[in-house]
Curated annotation (Swiss-Prot):
Domains (record comment): The C-terminal domain binds 2 Fe-S clusters but is otherwise mostly in an intrinsically disordered conformation.
Localization terms from the record: Cytoplasm; Mitochondrion intermembrane space
GO BP terms in the entry: cellular response to oxidative stress; iron-sulfur cluster assembly; negative regulation of hydrogen peroxide-mediated programmed cell death; negative regulation of nitric oxide biosynthetic process
Record-listed [2Fe-2S] cluster binding positions: C218, C229, C232, C234
Organism of this sequence: Pyrenophora tritici-repentis (strain Pt-1C-BFP) (Wheat tan spot fungus)
Subunit note: Monomer. Interacts with TAH18. Interacts with MIA40.
Major subcellular site: cytoplasm
Record gene name: dre2
Motif (Cx2C motif 2): 290-293
Transmembrane segments: none
A Pfam short name: CIAPIN1
Ranges where the record places region N-terminal SAM-like domain: 1-128
Stretches for region Disordered: 141-177
The protein's name: Fe-S cluster assembly protein dre2
Region spans: Linker: 129-208
Amino acid sequence: MAPRCLLIGTPSIAAHPERLDQVYEIHHRSSTDLQMLDRIAAGLVNLPAATYDVVLLLADADGTTRESHKLFSRDVMNKVASALKIGGVLKSQAGPFQGAEKTEAILAGLTETEDGMAKPEQEEPVSIPLKFGKNKANGVSATNGTNGAVNPDGSVPLNLNRKRDQPEPVKPAGVGFVDFSDDLDDPIITGEDDDLIDEDDLITEADMARPVVQPLECQPKPGKRRRACKDCTCGMKEKLEAEDAAKRSSADKALNSLKLDADDLAEVDFTVQGKVGSCGNCALGDAFRCDGCPYIGLPAFKPGEEVRLLNNDIQL
């Protein structure tokens, strides 16, 4: 079975397919994968774990490593190291790794070999028993307590009268007393002058500019709305809140467009102007009708026009 190989190219080499054809003459296409370094750095590509025997970092279109040096960060190196099999090798087309790239490879767990940066085998931890023998260090046997003395008959004498080490008495737990009689003139150390490190200073501009990779748990499932985690740190919570605020503001604008202000309302008077109210002028409107007039609430009508009230329905 041919060894699996991963080719990592820079954006500049994508415009020169002849460079890739030269590489494919050495590495067979059926067992070789090609990924772009900028897509790996942006988190758009996930490399499979423990898959490749060889990872080859291609040089730039001009034969240098300037572009790859800018994109080959610690995060990218960790992804490449995890994609290597045990014993796999990371190589560079431009030559051995130097400087920061070599340091990042070592920090990712790779070791320097003649072929490149190899992924070593992880040995299982071995427990080593430790024997503490104070008598053996002094040349005294732990069995008989003597310096190797033997009786004429071959027996080993036992020194039963030897003084044994007495353990120190355990001090009772209680309130301790501190003697300040000899350091009254010394200044009291309060710890206010200790240098404190601001955690914001540890974040560089490159870390802030790095795109946020959305975890697989935060990606929406088919048929379900996206929901942010309780302790969301990928920005999904802020994004959803901004979307909800935008939808709420657009709905408020649509609702306000349907509301009528006081200036938009007009009062319509159906009464006939210039008439004096008295009984018999019911056709002129409510202003000329009595309190008990049966036409209260009806619009004005022509004098002499017949008005019928049938089942509370007005018929003129």
